[in-house]
Each structure stands twice: as structure tokens, then as C-alpha cells.
């Protein structure tokens, strides 16, 4: 699977699992994304896909590296629709 395809799948999953925030952007907690069974099956390296999407300014989140448990409450915000 190529990176662009994985990012497009990630965007779909953020839309599926997330909610709109006050700014009208869709966001989801990292822990929700990480724990979702469909995401676990889709993404071999969820954190790597998130980093690639952040570099392309498709999503944003606090920090550089997200770890399960430690960063479960970090919001992943979709910047592009």
C-alpha cells in the first residue's frame, strides 16, 4: 500500500470515528483511533501514517510521536475535507 492511499484511508477513518469541534473541523482522540478494530486491521503503522499526514498538513496534533496509553487523549484534527 502506498502512503497516499493510506492517508486517504486515515482521513475516512477520522471522519467515521470523529466529531466536529467548535471550529467545524473533525477530530478524534488518538486512543479511539488506535483502539478501533477496523483501524488496527487497516494500518500496519498507524503512527507512521499519522506522521506522513501531518507533514502534508492533512491532520494536526500536539507533539511529534504518539504512544498508546500515554497520548490516548491527544486530539487528531482533520485540516482538509
Curated annotation (Swiss-Prot):
Instruction: State the source organism's domain of life.
Output: Eukaryota
An annotated GO BP: regulation of actin filament-based process
SMART domains on file: Costars
PANTHER family in UniProt:
COSTARS FAMILY PROTEIN ABRACL (PTHR46334:SF1)
Q: Member of which family?
A: Belongs to the costars family.
Q: By what name is this protein known?
A: Costars family protein ABRACL
Q: Say which species the protein is native to.
A: Coturnix coturnix (Common quail)
Lineage of this protein's species? Eukaryota, Metazoa, Chordata, Craniata, Vertebrata
